[in-house]
Design a protein with these regions (language model features):
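Nucleotidyltransferase catalytic core that binds NTPs
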Residues: 2-228, 236-240, 268, 274, ...
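Low-complexity, glycine/alanine/valine/leucine- and proline-rich hydrophobic stretches
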Residues: 254-261, 271, 282-291
Length: 291
């Protein structure tokens, strides 16, 4: 495995078809699943590790984001990553950027309205990675459903020749969606309220419920009763990420809540017939240390 911090060296290390896994480090099984997914169609798997300052609204959140360099390298090598690209802020942004990628519409609700500028930072860094590394494919997890919609729209609008590989949410054995921020969770019962609410809503949809309001209410009330401070529960169109009143198209039910000092997000992805992708569960404890 080759580790480099410059675009030039990373490109020199790559050969054949390239699959990219963009990350901010502190790897977990969700990131590793993304690497496995692009490996199936790629000669070379590149994983970027870069904590992108442009997507943080709060400087203290940026400073607090967990980091684990040696552990990340060991995990990347274990799953067969060929190149780790870990640039400095100066490599990614030689000067304070005057140009940003803004994907309107799809960023207006949910996380976009709560975290102004967040998705501009995400789209900008991903566009730079695509331009600098020129991958043939890139893997993104369905756990960040709105982010996935943003990236797919950016790729379509700007004509990047990159195939986006969607990877199902990876969950701990008790259902908690994996996130690097899970290490900060102190009240696990409250945190589990998010996934349990989503699963109950998915059960209801599977039984025929199509009302967005009712599905949102099931998810939100369940999480609240568990002790989570719910920010929103919204049924959204999978492509536009706009809120919809009825489950009658590909969609996702997203929830965001605060558990203590940690803000968590989760979702389930729906087909129009009410069937749901709830993600995959680990058989045992996560490498992050959870259940």
């Amino acid at each position: 495995m080759i580790v480099t911090d410059t675009f030039v060296a990373a490109r020199r290390a790559m050969s054949g078809t390239v699959g990219l896994v963009p990350t901010m480090g502190y790897l977990h099984e969700g990131h590793l699943a993304c690497a496995t997914a692009v490996r199936a169609t790629s000669d070379c798997v590149v994983m970027s590790i870069f904590v992108n300052p442009l997507q943080f609204n709060d400087p203290s959140d940026l400073a607090r984001y967990p980091r684990s360099w040696d552990r990340d390298l060991a995990l990347a090598e274990r799953v067969g990553v060929d190149v780790v690209f870990a640039p400095s802020v100066e490599e990614m942004y030689p000067e304070p950027p005057l140009t940003r990628v803004i994907v309107s519409g799809v960023t207006e609700g949910m996380e976009g309205s709560r975290r102004p500028g967040h998705f501009d930072g995400v789209a900008t860094v991903v566009a730079k990675l695509f331009a600098g590394l020129r991958p043939d494919s890139a893997a993104f997890g369905r756990k960040d459903a709105q982010q996935l919609a943003v990236i797919k729209r950016m790729v379509s609008d700007l004509g990047f020749p990159v195939t986006i590989v969607e990877v199902p949410t990876v969950r701990e054995s008790d259902g908690l969606a994996l996130s690097s921020r899970n290490v900060f969770i102190e009240d696990r019962r409250a945190a589990l309220g998010l996934s349990r609410g989503l699963f109950l809503a998915a059960d209801s949809a599977g039984a025929g419920e199509r009302s967005g309001r009712i599905l949102e209410d099931i998810a939100g009330r369940t999480a609240s009763r568990a002790g989570a401070l719910v920010d929103y529960a919204e049924l959204a169109d999978a492509r536009s990420a706009r809120r919809i009143p009825t489950l009658d198209r590909p969609a996702f039910l997203a929830i965001a809540a605060r558990v203590g000092a940690v803000r968590l997000i989760d979702n389930v992805v729906f087909e129009p017939d009410g069937s749901a992708d709830r993600g995959t569960r680990l058989d045992g404890p996560s490498i992050l240390g959870g259940s």
